[in-house]
């Protein structure tokens, strides 16, 4: 009985760590898409938009640069398809 409990606990921990790793990877990917030159930003909000309202729209928020949109669409990441080697 004790071995079954340990096995179940091990499976639950592995699933939890897997979910956590996936969430961190998605968060990192989101951050990477928001990094761009201010002149490349395409407005996604409205005057006076808050960071929370902006992120709820699925957009990026950065109010550190005046004169450019603070709430803006994330940069699209191009999916690079794997090429098969002709070997």
From Swiss-Prot:
Strong expression found in normal gastric mucosa. Not detected in the small or large intestine nor in normal mammary gland. One of its GO terms (cellular component) is extracellular region. Its main location: secreted. Keywords: Disulfide bond, Growth factor, Pyrrolidone carboxylic acid, Secreted, Signal. Disulfide bonds join 34-60, 44-59, 54-71. PROSITE patterns: P_TREFOIL_1 (PS00025), P_TREFOIL_2 (PS51448). The keyword Lipid metabolism does not apply. The keyword Disulfide bond applies. Stabilizer of the mucous gel overlying the gastrointestinal mucosa that provides a physical barrier against various noxious agents. This is Trefoil factor 1. The gene is Tff1.
């Amino acid at each position: 009985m004790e071995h079954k409990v340990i096995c179940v606990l091990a499976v639950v921990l592995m699933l939890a760590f897997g979910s956590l790793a996936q969430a961190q990877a998605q968060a990192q990917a989101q951050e990477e898409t928001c990094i761009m030159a201010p002149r490349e930003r395409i407005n996604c909000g409205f005057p006076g938009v808050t960071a929370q309202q902006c992120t709820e729209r699925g957009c990026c928020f950065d109010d550190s640069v005046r004169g450019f949109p603070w709430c803006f669409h994330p940069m699209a990441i191009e999916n690079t398809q794997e090429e098969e080697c002709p070997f």
